[in-house]
Amino acid sequence: MSSLPVTRLTERDYLTLERAAQYKSEFVGDEMFAMSGGSARHSRLAGLVFSELDAQLKGSGCAPFTSDLRVRTPLGDQFYPDVSVGCAPIQNPDGSVDVYTNPVIIVEVLSPSTANYDRGLKFVLYREIPSLTDCLVFHYDAIHVEHYGRQPNDSWLLLQHHHGEDARIQLPSIQCELALGPIYAGAMDWPG
């Protein structure tokens, strides 16, 4: 995320600009922020997580989405998570097809330029999404994933730090399991 806001906007202004833009921007509060590009490793990690979830979710009524589909928070903030999972029917505000409001899982792959933002303000805003059950934060430089889960009292808890090639992440809300070894093996040889 760029450190300088482009301008102060309404959500409607943001959507008009974003839908015509040649690059992606996120909307936080009343500010629009241009997104920085990702590395080859970042792209591979996100792609491999997407592929694994896609294979496991076929026929389940749920599906993973790439960072081309925005997620909207109840406050109107809009983000492009690296991967999100939605279950049918996904809810599109005002009939829009490029944004939805009810993700179940959000995956962010950290990068040096976005790590503080992804774990800070963005995660605070993600937690406001009522349908969200899990948020996974993949580190780009080591086999390490932080798994945050919504608790029955609506609080969020760091469920586990997953380390190493044998680590597995259980996602009971979508009945999936992610094996970290194969995901990271397909990404770590790429520049990061």
Locate predicted features.
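Gly/Pro/Ser/Thr-rich low-complexity, intrinsically disordered segments predominantly at protein N-termini
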Residues: M1-G192
